Amino acid sequence: EHLNVALQCGGSDAWSGITSNPSLGYAADLIVKNGGTAILAETPEIYGAEHMLTRRAITPEVGKKLIDRIHWWEDYTARNKASLNNNPSPGNKAGGLTTILEKSLGAAAKGGTTPLNDVLLYAQQSNKKGFLFMDSPGYDPTSVTGQVASGCNIVTFTTGRGSCFGCNPSPSIKIASNTEMYNKMVEDMDVNAGKVISDNKSIEDVLSLIHI
């Protein structure tokens, strides 16, 4: 009940939505079902997959809060002569992601399957437990900062392309989506979810390696 876990990703690839993100989502479900809290963030990176979260909203009002934040980001990017469809990044594309929809479906998988209990503004704290969403940019250092400010005491971070990101205020658990990248960055990674592909392991097998 004292765990408040940030669900985060950076440098995603085509394997992220198949291995590391569903594994983290499974872990998030167990945390929530045992009285803890798990907070997903990065609003622009669920664009196109927001229905997967709103249909889990505990009330229509909670679902509307998420849609309102999506609309804010649509307006913000339009005012700056850009579009949320400009995502994914060149690195994501090099890793096999071709559209924001593919990226968003994978990103949403980190949130597991439990009800969405609240939608928070950036760095906003809440007295609610369970699965929450926090509005933030799609830039992991900024997003994680907001999650920690909102009360997260552990950061879980999935990556497919590789990332040296760490968070000094909170312990960080790094989860690789593929074995090749894990082996190249083994000193920066904690869990190899790529074993789902390379070693024919199950999501449950990977979960046993995520010690939270």
Briefly describe each language-model feature range.
Residues 8-170, 174:
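Glycine-rich anion/phosphate-binding loop at the beta-strand->alpha-helix junction
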Residues 171-173, 178-208:
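A hydrophobic, small-residue-rich beta->alpha segment in the mid-to-C-terminal subdomain
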Residues 210-212:
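Conserved small/polar residues in nucleotide/adenosyl-binding loops
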